[in-house]
Amino acid sequence: MVTERSARESPEQRAAEQVVLVVDDDEDLADTCRYWLDGERFAVETAYGGEEALHRLDDTVDVVLLDRRMPNVTGDDVLEEIRERGLDCRVAMMTAVEPDTDIVEMPFDAYLVKPVSESEVKETVEELLVRSGFESGVREYFALESTEAALDSRDVEELREPEALSDLRSRLEAVRAEHEAAIRNREAQLDRLNRTNELLRDVDRALIDARTRDEIEQTVCDVVADAHEAAVVLRRTAAGTLRCTAAAGHGLDPAGVDLDFVDEAFGVDGAAEDGFVFEDIPGAHRAAVLGDDADDLDAVSALCVSIDYRETMYGALVVYDETDGFDDESAGLFSDLGATVGNGINATQSKRLLNGDSVVELEFQVGRDAGVLARLSAALDCQLSLDGVTRLDDGLACFISVAGASGCDAVAAAIDAVDVSQARVVADGDEESVVELRTDAEAVLSTAIDHGASVERLTLSEGSGTLTLHVAADADHGALVEAVTTAAAGVSVVAKREVERSVQSADSFRRALDSKLTDRQRTVLETSLVSGYFEWPRGSTAEEVADSLGISPPTLHEHLRTAERKLIETYFDELNQAPADD
């Protein structure tokens, strides 16, 4: 069985976020910026032109990335309209138009010259969101500073009105003199933001080579400790105690960390309170963490963020620094880091499950109180089997085979259940039907997937049945069993066994695929690959690839989709082969 994961966000989550609007008539670039920014702590929308942007703009938009050179309604027009409407949003001009002194009086907040990089776009958006909370005079200073920086890239003699740059600098000095203290404080705040962003990028790069959970945790501590005083990773044991599994900074030894102090950051459910800051930690704990260097610092603070993936709590990261080392922005970014680490741990476990020569198989008995599928089986007095499940942020999409009841009856019964948001008949046969339903009331399956397990089988008859999970051999099986059996009533583990996988070589996979592909399909696949058609953004359009092959775009798509289907079928046919019998 295939277990999928989706990173889709619920409407409620997106509504609570800050909104970034990308405006560009180059749809590929606009989509690329959205792709870069997706998954950050804000919602991203696109407008493919000035008119579309004016229709979308309202007081819910926080940051606008705005192209200047667009047909009909230019970026300059959009910027003017934003200010005339009195919309309180930050605007970054993002354009290939080389800056000149005409920009001095334009009321933007930042100016980016294309081509732009992913890090440049992300950092600009993050900074502008922070600047939104600045006093108006301080915001004006940073906007003027951005204008000066854009013009500094030009030779003064080439500027249309060189004296305008001199006037700008005089104005910049005057604004700074008026708000000197506030500007210094905000500069320090932005500096911390930039250092934390750089730290996150360092962690992302370092995690690429980490292959186990232990490696991930130690790598994170090493990178974080390079930028701060020290860092430790904590895990909550089955007995409810805290255990330090990785540490770095000042020669810190995980075994020597007294964890009673940090325990305050954990709730009764064992989850860390995200962004919990200890303003000044006790002397004994300082000495344990910082050793002989403890006396060199006037005071030390600690930031505790959870390491989690969806609903799965892996532990916590504790970062130590000087007392003023953390603010709301850096705490929020460290929370993102905790989520990144949790995602990395989950992905590592999933890879080891996928690539391991052996896996651990866990079998559970489930009763009618285990979830909506068990209750549906009982209500219809029928047999259900789970064919596939996709993890969504707001629940699961389940594909089930129904025997002993029609697909229409199953859909009707599912719709009557308050825990099912959507149901449809996929295929209705005489003896068996296939139904898709979406629900947030399958906590057992959601918990298993979030812990990195693969749902192999779920069979139910008249309300009860068995659930079979596969999990990596080196995963924390005890934690998984505890999480699954406590996710819902009527669930108990009945068997645990190690299963050897059948091994097929890469050559056998290629032979299986070659036997299915026609010469034309193989050529279309290879040409699309080497031409960059599968890259983001695309290196070649479908029209360009089709032209190189001497075929029409519709014919290209027909061959390409057929070849992709055969490739995917071959992959999953091998992936889902039953374990070899010994």
From Swiss-Prot:
Coiled-coil ranges from the UniProt annotation: 165-203
Alphabetized, the UniProt keywords read: Coiled coil, DNA-binding, Phosphoprotein, Transcription, Transcription regulation, Two-component regulatory system
Q: Which superkingdom?
A: Archaea
What does the record note as the disruption phenotype of the gene behind this chain?
Cells having transposon insertions in this gene are hypermotile.
Modified-residue entries (4-aspartylphosphate), positions: D67
SMART domains, per database record: REC
* One Pfam family linked to the record: HTH_10
Q: Where is the HTH bat-type domain?
A: 517-569
SUPFAM superfamilies on file? CheY-like, GAF domain-like, Sigma3 and sigma4 domains of RNA polymerase sigma factors
A GO term (biological process) for this protein? Answer: regulation of cell motility
An example of a GO molecular function for this protein is: DNA binding
Does the record carry Ion transport as a key word? no
Please tell me whether the keyword Transcription is annotated for this protein: yes
Ranges for domain Response regulatory come to: 19-129
Which Gene3D superfamilies does this entry report, sorted A to Z? 3.30.450.40, 3.40.50.2300, Winged helix-like DNA-binding domain superfamily/Winged helix DNA-binding domain (1.10.10.10)
What job does this protein perform?
May be part of a signal-dependent gene regulation cascade that is relevant to swimming motility. May be involved in the transcription regulation of target genes.
Q: What is this protein called?
A: Putative transcriptional regulator HVO_1357
Q: Which organism is it from?
A: Haloferax volcanii (strain ATCC 29605 / DSM 3757 / JCM 8879 / NBRC 14742 / NCIMB 2012 / VKM B-1768 / DS2) (Halobacterium volcanii)
